[in-house]
Amino acid sequence: MYGIEYTTVLTFLISLILLNYILKSLTRMMDFIIYRFLFIVVILSPLLKAQNYGINLPITGSMDTAYANSTQEETFLTSTLCLYYPTEAATEINDNSWKDTLSQLFLTKGWPTGSVYFKEYTDIASFSVDPQLYCDYNVVLMKYDATLQLDMSELADLILNEWLCNPMDITLYYYQQTDEANKWISMGSSCTIKVCPLNTQTLGIGCLTTDTATFEEVATAEKLVITDVVDGVNHKLDVTTATCTIRNCKKLGPRENVAVIQVGGSDVLDITADPTTAPQTERMMRINWKKWWQVFYTVVDYVNQIIQAMSKRSRSLNSAAFYYRI
């Protein structure tokens, strides 16, 4: 009788131990499955775009405007914007808190405080030497000046494109441009450029290599010059080296994260006629300009439309950078 009771108790204990082992095994198996599933989700989530079935609200949190359901890439939430302006803008506004005001206005367009940087430059000449286009998106405001029309046009060509440049020693060497993308870029306080094309015997064509007065003058007292001559022909150059430097440059393609906005002026500067601008796309906007506050209000109002036409830190050769005018 006691043997049967001991057997029953022993059987119960063995069953309890076996059940405990089975439960632990199931727990370990479920943990493995769950962790493996979560690992796969984490790996694949950056590669997938899911449909958003919620309501997208403006960053200000306003409930006044609801946008259609969609999966959107909110560029401004992870990007920086640099706004370059001439010194005269800050002088005219004459308000120590004007940048803070604009930052709050950019916030209403979805650009968080701290993502927009305001960079001042003295004049076109100093800006062209060292543009410092450091942000993901760069918008340059250029006040139209009839006396600097050529410099403005060439500055736009300079900063809207990527260039690879090397120094030139015009005292020792002749130079030729190999193709349409090859230009000579000169910068300085006053650049006067003269050229003398040479034949195969290195004799001047319509000029004397020993007399710079017979050279053909292609630029006079400009601050920025992009010189284009006949390809495949050697040239002897004369440059005002005391006030100007010249470089042999190759246009690599559009700098798609830069926009130039012309402020005011009756003439529209156009750089798309250059055969090296491919595709020849011109995008412009214009408002009646009176004061710098009006200019900045317009930029804030249209900033997202401008950004949509640009590419973030891109050097793609497939689409052109653009030139805006207000």
Curated annotation (Swiss-Prot):
It comes from the Viruses. Ca(2+) 2 binds at residues 177, 228-229, 231, 301. One of its GO terms (biological process) is receptor-mediated virion attachment to host cell. Keywords: Calcium, Capsid protein, Disulfide bond, Glycoprotein, Host endoplasmic reticulum, Host-virus interaction, Metal-binding, Outer capsid protein, Signal, T=13 icosahedral capsid protein, Virion. N-glycosylated. The N-terminus is blocked possibly by pyroglutamic acid. It holds the Pfam family VP7. Residues 165-167 are annotated as: CNP motif. GO terms for molecular function: metal ion binding. GO terms for cellular component: host cell endoplasmic reticulum lumen; T=13 icosahedral viral capsid; viral outer capsid. Residues 237-239 are annotated as: LVD motif. Ca(2+) 1 binds at residues 95, 206, 214, 216. It is found in: Virion; Host endoplasmic reticulum lumen. Glycans are attached at residue 69. Some rotavirus strains are neuraminidase-sensitive and require sialic acid to attach to the cell surface. Some rotavirus strains are integrin-dependent. Some rotavirus strains depend on ganglioside for their entry into the host cell. Hsp70 also seems to be involved in the entry of some strains. In group A rotaviruses, VP7 defines the G serotype. Homotrimer; disulfide-linked. 2 Ca(2+) ions bound at each subunit interface in the trimer hold the trimer together. Interacts with the intermediate capsid protein VP6. Interacts with the outer capsid protein VP5*. Interacts with host integrin heterodimer ITGAV/ITGB3. Belongs to the rotavirus VP7 family. This is Outer capsid glycoprotein VP7. It comes from Rotavirus A (strain RVA/Monkey/United States/RRV/1975/G3P5B[3]).
